């Protein structure tokens, strides 16, 4: 893993976008994208740039089960408001939270990924080491599937909802096996509350107990941190 440490998340987000631009200059056509507060500075850098994304395809990691695309807490809504409405892409794929059947939706999404191999995958990391909604215990060979959210993830996401009771209990998530097929991976982490997970991901053993540790098995991963998220690393 190539670890890059920045003073703040704004600088880190700009650097992540620089890597995406380099990839696009070298022919990248498919971006794997993430939601949540972590990639927002990267999306701001993308929106404020003069880069044209109209020939690019995006594939998002996950979506809450049960939320409509126009629900302001859905990940489709997040992507539209933070990026797609401001920088149009050729195609944008996000799991359908209102799909009638989980098996049908996960099969559809796995085909989307197979038909559009991801050149650059952007990830965040949860406090418990999850990537996407691949919680501790997730198999490393999994594809897209419907997953239950752990209580710690529900607690972490409750701040975005009116109450904890409103937080969805399930999500569709790209699996770790699918993530590892990406040609290049950028993992962003900011804040002291991510420091333990970052240390385990980089310096700990490869274990299903820390889903992000699977990235040690990938040949091209750039970990982009602010100083707080890097604060517990032995080597800086």
Swiss-Prot record:
EC identifiers of the protein: 3.5.99.6
Transmembrane stretches, start-end: none
Gene: nagB
Domain of life of the organism encoding this protein: Bacteria
Residue numbers annotated as active site: 62 (proton acceptor), 128 (for ring-opening step), 130 (proton acceptor), 135 (for ring-opening step)
NCBIfam families assigned to the protein according to its UniProt record, in alphabetical order: nagB (TIGR00502)
Biological function: Catalyzes the reversible isomerization-deamination of glucosamine 6-phosphate (GlcN6P) to form fructose 6-phosphate (Fru6P) and ammonium ion.
Enzyme type, top EC level: hydrolase
Entry-linked Pfam families: Glucosamine_iso
InterPro entries (UniProt xref): Glc/Gal-6P_isomerase, Glucosamine6P_isomerase, Glucosamine6P_isomerase_CS, NagB/RpiA_transferase-like
SUPFAM superfamilies found in the cross-reference section: NagB/RpiA/CoA transferase-like (SSF100950)
Family: Belongs to the glucosamine/galactosamine-6-phosphate isomerase family. NagB subfamily.
Keywords from the UniProt entry: Carbohydrate metabolism, Hydrolase
Catalyzed chemical reaction(s): alpha-D-glucosamine 6-phosphate + H2O = beta-D-fructose 6-phosphate + NH4(+)
GO cellular-component term (any): cytoplasm
Protein name from the UniProt record: Glucosamine-6-phosphate deaminase
HAMAP family: GlcN6P_deamin (MF_01241)
Signal peptide per UniProt: none
An MF annotation (GO) of this entry: glucosamine-6-phosphate deaminase activity
An example Gene Ontology biological process: carbohydrate metabolic process
The protein's annotated pathway: Amino-sugar metabolism; N-acetylneuraminate degradation; D-fructose 6-phosphate from N-acetylneuraminate: step 5/5
């Amino acid at each position: 893993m190539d670890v890059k440490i920045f003073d703040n998340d704004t600088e880190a987000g700009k650097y992540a976008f620089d890597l995406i631009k380099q990839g696009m200059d070298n022919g990248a056509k498919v971006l794997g994208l993430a939601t949540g507060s972590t990639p927002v500075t990267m999306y701001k850098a993308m929106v404020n740039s003069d880069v044209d994304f109209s020939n690019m395809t995006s594939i998002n990691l996950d979506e809450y089960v049960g939320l409509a695309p126009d629900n302001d807490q859905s990940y489709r809504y997040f992507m539209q408001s933070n990026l797609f409405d401001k920088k149009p892409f050729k195609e944008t794929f996000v799991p359908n939270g209102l799909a009638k059947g989980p098996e049908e939706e996960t099969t559809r999404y796995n085909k989307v990924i197979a038909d559009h191999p991801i050149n650059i995958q952007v990830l965040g990391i949860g406090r418990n080491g999850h990537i996407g909604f691949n919680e501790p215990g997730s198999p490393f060979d999994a594809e897209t599937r419907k997953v239950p959210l752990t209580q710690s993830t529900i607690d972490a996401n409750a701040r975005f909802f009116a109450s904890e009771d409103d937080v969805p209990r399930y999500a569709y998530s790209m699996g770790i096996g699918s993530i590892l097929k990406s040609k290049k991976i950028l993992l962003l982490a900011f804040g002291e509350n991510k420091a333990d997970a970052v240390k385990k991901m980089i310096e700990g053993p490869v274990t299903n107990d820390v889903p992000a540790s699977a990235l040690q098995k990938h040949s091209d991963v750039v970990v982009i941190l602010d100083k707080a998220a890097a604060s517990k690393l032995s080597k800086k």
